[in-house]
Structure formats: structure tokens, C-alpha cells
């Protein structure tokens, strides 16, 4: 398939943005030699490839005219492959846009995802979900206002969207397991009887199950393995995950109940050096992860999952902050509970073999403190991680 070259686009905002009768694509990759935008039909067949322009300040860009919402796409990034230097570029891997707001297709575990010598040339596109271009979602918030309940008066109820609504006998059968079920009169009445002022939803961003679970015929029910930090999980939607999530928030707010999200920015599903290349590893491994100082082919494992997101790097930090702002401004959530929050405060010290020691003044904490979009939002930290120095209670 011959690549066409896209007209120049804008380097900001990152992700896919509809404007002027087309879509602007912007993707960060500091070490890439080339970036290719791959377009797919609804059956998962690749129909076009477009060469991106750049980089400009490490951002590759392009404008695809005469298209818009619903376009299905992924990226291929070519660059040096040298794990000993922390470089893992591989154009055989179709990569998910970290800024994807909706996904198409299901993730399937397959050896073509794995970063092994015997699978380097294997194409993984058939087993990857793709990003879907979304525009401005039309939704009537009907004057929605945050309840703004003081923390000292809050009664926070941790709940799994599917588990809670599946188990409640008065939630309509067709709504069980969904965002709409959480917004049903029966669910809200139950919460009100308990005196709940806020629901803390276990992870509702798109996630995948670990390979070891799949091999045992199981799944990661809880969702602590996030694949798309901007996309509401389709498992809990009937048709439109974005607007059904918004409807849930609006209804809960209408009854004085806040919505707090349990978020997992400390690691990704890409695991350790033997894990799959799905997005960040293939886009810019050195930027997104804490790597071993002694051997950058290995990852610093502060999370117990195989990798740790480097929130002190500006591009990883920008992704996290952009995601938080999206959920606050576009989805009207009232707060966040940060899983293994100590990881987000780990920074690399000069002349140290430790790639990340905890610092209470780390870039992530400073960024959150100064962001006006997050002012007044409830912020809850799990004050530890799985490594030395991480217990910060």
C-alpha cells in the first residue's frame, strides 16, 4: 500500500481534532524517523496510509481533508530499535493514539504484540482496537451544576458500575451493568437511602485484561489496566459510551450526588520488557516510562505490573493533565482517586542509579496545584506504591 503525504497540520492539540471540513492529527514522538497514519473501515480492513509531517518540537502532524467524526485510525512509527538505549520503535506494530476518546474493535492477545526477536516482523493490526475520531459531542447538560459538597461532609461510596447495577434487583434488566443503570431511579434511591454524597467509580476508562488472565479463561473485571485514558469503557454502555456516561453524571448531580473516578495513571498494559507494544512503548518509550539506569532495556517496576509511567517527563505529564481536564470539563466529574499515587511523584535524581525517587514537590503535584480546571475538584491519593520509599501516608 503506497503512502500518500498529508497536508501540513497543527501541532496542537495532540490527538485527532475536527475542524474546517477535515481532521487534524498531532502525535508526539521524539525519536521517530517517520510516522504513518493508517485508516481502517468498520470491518478492520486498512484502506489508506498517509505519511505525517514533522517533527515540529517532537510533534508529527497532518490534516486529512473531507472527513470527520467516525474515522477509524491508528499509527505506525518507524525509528531506531535498540532496547539497550530504551528505544523500541517498530513499524510492524499498529499503535493506539494515547488521546483516543473512543475505540473501535476489541483487543485480542496475540504474540504479534510482544516485543521479542522472533515476533519483530509480525504485524499486530488485526488484533488491535483502533481509535475513532470524535467531534464535539452534542449533549444537553440542562444547566448541570456540581453539588460541591465539602469533603468533611462527604460520604463516599466506592462502587463498580457493572457489579452494583447487575446486583440491584430493582434496576431494569436492560440497564443492568451500564452507566444508565447507575442513573436509574432505583440505583439513585438506594444511594440516597444510604446517605451517600458521592460515588467513587472503580476504573471506567477503557482497559484490557492481562495475558496471564486470558490464558486462564479469566478477565480483569476491575479495570486497573488502562488502555485509553480519555475513553469511557464501552463495556458499561449500551450504544454511546460518551453521552451515556454524561447522562449518568447529570442524573447523579440532579440528586446531589457527586461522581469521583478511580484513575490508574501509574502504569499501562504494556508490562515489562517482555510485554506487548500497544501505544506508548512504540511511540516514545524513553519519554513515557521510568527505565532502569543500569540497563534501559528494563523498566523500573514501582507498581508491581512491570512498568511505571514517568509523570516527571513533560509529555507523560501533559497526557495525564490533559486527561484529567477532559474528564472535568467535558464529562463533569467531581474528583479523582489516584491509584498508587506515589508513582506519580517519583523523579529521577542526577547522578543516581535510581530512576525515580519520591518527591512531594514532583512535577505532577505542582501541575495539579496550579491548574485552574482542577481547582475545587476532590483529589484522593492512594499514598503508596510497590517500591522502597513509596509509602507516604
PLM regions and their residue ranges:
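N-terminal structural segment of carbohydrate-active enzymes
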Residues: 1-235
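Beta-sheet entry/capping signal
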Residues: 24-26, 154-155, 197-200, 256-258, ...
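Proline-centered flexible-loop/turn and helix-kink motifs
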Residues: 30, 373-375
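Nucleotide-sugar donor-binding loop of glycosyltransferases
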Residues: 31, 263, 383
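Structural signature of outer-membrane beta-barrel domains
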Residues: 82, 343-345, 386
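Substrate-binding/active-site clefts of carbohydrate-active enzymes
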Residues: 160-332, 340-370
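Polar, glycine-rich mid-to-C-terminal structural blocks
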Residues: 352, 360, 365-369, 376-393
Amino acid at each position: 500500500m503506497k503512502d500518500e503525504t498529508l497536508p501540513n497540520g497543527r501541532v496542537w492539540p495532540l490527538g485527532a481534532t475536527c475542524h474546517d471540513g477535515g481532521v487534524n492529527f498531532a502525535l508526539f514522538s521524539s525519536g521517530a524517523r517517520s510516522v504513518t497514519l493508517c485508516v481502517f473501515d468498520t470491518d478492520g480492513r486498512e484502506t489508506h496510509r498517509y505519511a505525517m509531517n514533522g517533527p515540529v518540537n517532537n510533534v508529527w502532524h497532518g490534516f486529512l481533508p473531507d472527513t470527520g467524526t467516525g474515522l477509524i485510525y491508528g499509527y505506525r512509527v518507524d525509528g531506531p530499535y535498540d532496547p539497550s538505549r530504551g528505544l523500541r520503535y517498530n513499524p510492524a506494530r499498529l499503535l493506539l493514539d494515547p488521546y483516543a476518546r473512543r475505540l473501535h474493535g476489541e483487543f485480542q492477545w496475540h504474540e504479534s504484540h510482544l516485543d521479542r526477536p522472533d515476533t519483530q516482523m509480525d504485524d499486530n493490526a488485526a488484533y488491535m482496537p483502533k481509535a475513532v475520531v470524535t467531534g464535539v459531542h452534542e449533549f444537553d447538560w440542562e444547566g448541570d451544576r456540581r453539588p460541591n459538597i465539602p469533603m468533611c461532609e462527604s460520604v463516599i461510596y466506592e462502587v463498580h458500575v457493572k457489579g452494583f447495577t447487575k446486583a440491584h434487583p430493582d434496576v431494569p434488566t436492560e440497564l443492568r451493568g451500564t452507566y444508565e443503570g447507575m442513573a436509574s431511579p432505583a440505583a439513585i434511591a438506594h444511594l440516597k437511602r444510604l446517605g451517600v454524597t458521592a460515588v467513587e467509580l472503580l476504573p471506567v476508562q477503557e482497559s484490557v485484561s492481562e495475558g496471564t488472565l486470558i490464558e486462564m479463561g479469566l478477565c480483569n473485571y476491575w479495570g486497573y489496566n488502562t488502555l485509553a485514558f480519555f475513553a469511557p469503557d464501552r463495556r458499561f454502555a449500551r450504544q454511546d459510551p460518551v453521552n451515556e456516561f454524561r447522562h449518568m453524571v447529570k442524573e447523579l448531580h440532579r440528586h446531589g450526588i457527586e461522581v469521583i473516578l478511580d484513575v490508574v495513571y501509574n502504569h499501562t498494559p504494556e508490562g515489562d520488557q517482555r510485554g506487548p507494544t500497544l501505544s506508548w512503548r512504540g511511540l516514545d518509550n524513553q519519554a513515557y516510562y521510568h527505565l532502569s539506569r543500569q540497563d534501559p532495556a528494563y523498566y523500573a517496576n514501582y507498581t508491581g505490573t512491570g512498568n511505571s509511567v514517568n509523570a516527571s517527563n513533560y509529555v507523560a505529564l501533559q497526557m495525564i493533565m490533559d486527561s484529567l481536564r477532559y474528564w472535568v470539563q467535558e464529562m463533569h466529574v467531581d474528583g479523582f482517586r489516584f491509584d498508587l499515587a506515589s508513582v506519580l511523584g517519583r523523579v529521577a535524581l542526577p547522578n543516581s542509579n535510581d530512576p525515580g525517587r519520591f518527591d512531594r514537590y514532583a512535577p505532577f503535584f505542582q501541575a495539579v496545584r496550579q491548574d485552574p480546571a482542577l481547582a475545587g475538584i476532590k483529589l484522593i491519593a492512594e499514598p503508596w506504591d510497590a517500591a522502597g520509599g513509596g509509602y507516604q501516608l
